[in-house]
Amino acid sequence: MFSWLKKGGARGQRPEAIRTVTSSLKELYRTKLLPLEEHYRFGSFHSPALEDADFDGKPMVLVAGQYSTGKTSFIQYLLEQEVPGSRVGPEPTTDCFVAVMHGETEGTVPGNALVVDPEKPFRKLNPFGNTFLNRFMCAQLPNQVLESISIIDTPGILSGAKQRVSRGYDFPAVLRWFAERVDLIILLFDAHKLEISDEFSEAIGALRGHEDKIRVVLNKADMVETQQLMRVYGALMWALGKVVGTPEVLRVYIGSFWSQPLLVPDNRRLFELEEQDLFRDIQGLPRHAALRKLNDLVKRARLVRVHAYIISYLKKEMPTVFGKENKKKQLILKLPVIFAKIQLEHHISPGDFPDCQKMQELLMAHDFTKFHSLKPKLLEALDDMLAQDIAKLMPLLRQEELESVEAGVQGGAFEGTRMGPFVERGPDEAIEDGEEGSEDDAEWVVTKDKSKYDEIFYNLAPADGKLSGSKAKTWMVGTKLPNSVLGRIWKLSDVDRDGMLDDEEFALASHLIEAKLEGHGLPTNLPRRLVPPSKRRQKGSAE
């Protein structure tokens, strides 16, 4: 599984292909698209102008869902680490937008400080006001997963009577702003209490136009039995069909994305396969980052072109002296007809036009006399960018990506899916080498319980004093812990990396499993006090 992932020097580095294409996109935007946006006030009607940080930033994943669907737990499951300032509980615990990003030390940065940082891609969030900025923060922590991607945690979307309480800022508009800039949108649903509230429907509507980025996760699926899960899945697909409004079916992943034992383990194999598919999607984000930016720039350019035609048409229809206000009202009322006329005259696809009702509302606040007439040179530059410059970048992107070292998201839960017998591999594939454990003469903390673990070990019928990976897996799966967690335990326990466990390694694995079941975390590397005594001696003599 994930055979294309390499553990070499690519970690933390972006391929040269992405840097080259990204710099070209920045130059094209500044020289050919931005002048048109400024001339026709595109930022006042749609999204504000892009900055260098929008092009240079890491891929971002937006996690959204109703309260208590497991959004924060999902993020902590991916990172295998708690997020600073986060809380987990059945009530709406996340009341703000949290940008989870890499940092050398753990800490949080408040929203007002975040939007003035030129290195972060959040400067254009300033117009949403102080109420929103007080509900926005960045959580920084040293984590290998965050070296490749950033994750946006969102407030729990309210349901029932709670959704009538105002947030004090335009929540759907903020979601739309993030949706335009992220690489992947994950919508979480709770299999145990499936519902789509009015606010959630409005939030999903704000994501319209970005359906290609959306992935749906049916979380907490271990709380229901197989027959109930089938009914819940069918109900979810029916509800999504009503809300999303596209004929295409969204990809739905089913699982239980936290590091606790499965409550109903009947569908364990299904959850494993679904988790692997979702992880592949996330791990591929760094490789496809430049392509996504190119795609989003083309989408933006097409909208800017249509916007220029609309604004210039309204300017042309305005009288020079009298009756300006009445004419403005007439033009806004006739906007659907104007859209159809522009579409036929300039041979533009209906999908390139903005939402007519929203455009009518925005136009009410603008002075049409300050609009500009059509500037053919600006439009020619835009058409040249779409027809010539972007087309030249496509083969360059493909060629340079082939020549570059492919790097994916590593660390956290992604590491556990590739460890020992818990990795999906072909029959001839060998277990990958891992990092060696530490050595020390300190007392082994597992000794006091080793007799208990030895009884289990010998009942599993080891061959030549060692337990094979398949036998160990059968026993470990019985603990109902997720495969990604068991994979990390295997990596820590198989100290000599021979793909089998001797009595000491098995005792170590049992100790780590018990610690995890009691709610403790797993170490990133094996601490010196946990390294089996015989392995310390072997390593010492080898040196």
Curated annotation (Swiss-Prot):
Residues bearing the modification Phosphoserine: 3, 44, 438, 468, 470, 484, 493
Region annotation (G2 motif) ranges: 91-92
InterPro entries documented for this protein: DUF5600 (IPR040990), Dynamin_N (IPR045063), EF-hand-dom_pair (IPR011992), EF_Hand_1_Ca_BS (IPR018247), EF_hand_dom (IPR002048), EH_dom (IPR000261), EHD_N (IPR031692), G_DYNAMIN_dom (IPR030381)
Keyword Cytoplasm carried by entry: yes
Membrane topology: Peripheral membrane protein
Residue ranges, annotated region (G1 motif): 65-72
Record comment: activity regulation: The very low intrinsic ATPase activity is increased upon interaction with liposomes.
Region (G3 motif) location: 153-156
Keywords attached to this entry: ATP-binding, Calcium, Cell membrane, Cytoplasm, Endosome, Hydrolase, Membrane, Metal-binding, Nucleotide-binding, Phosphoprotein
Cross-referenced SMART domains: EH
Annotated binding of ATP, by residue: 65-72, 220, 258
UniProt subcellular location: Cell membrane; Membrane, Caveola; Endosome membrane; Cytoplasm, Cytosol
SUPFAM superfamilies, A to Z: EF-hand (SSF47473), P-loop containing nucleoside triphosphate hydrolases (SSF52540)
Stretches assigned to the EF-hand domain: 481-516
Keyword DNA repair among UniProt keywords: no
Residues engaged in binding Ca(2+): 494, 496, 498, 500, 505
Domain EH: 449-537
Bias kind Basic residues: ranges: 534-543
GO biological process, one term: positive regulation of endocytic recycling
Start and end residues of each stretch annotated as Disordered: 521-543
Free-text tissue specificity from the UniProt record: Detected in lung and adipocytes. Detected at lower levels in heart and skeletal muscle.
Subunit record text: Homodimer and homooligomer. Interacts with EHD1. May also interact with EHD3 and EHD4. Interacts with MYOF. Interacts with EHBP1. Interacts with FER1L5 (via second C2 domain). Interacts with CAV1 in a cholesterol-dependent manner. Interacts (via EH domain) with PACSIN2 (via NPF motifs); this interaction probably stabilizes the caveolae.
Protein name in UniProt: EH domain-containing protein 2
Gene name of this polypeptide: Ehd2
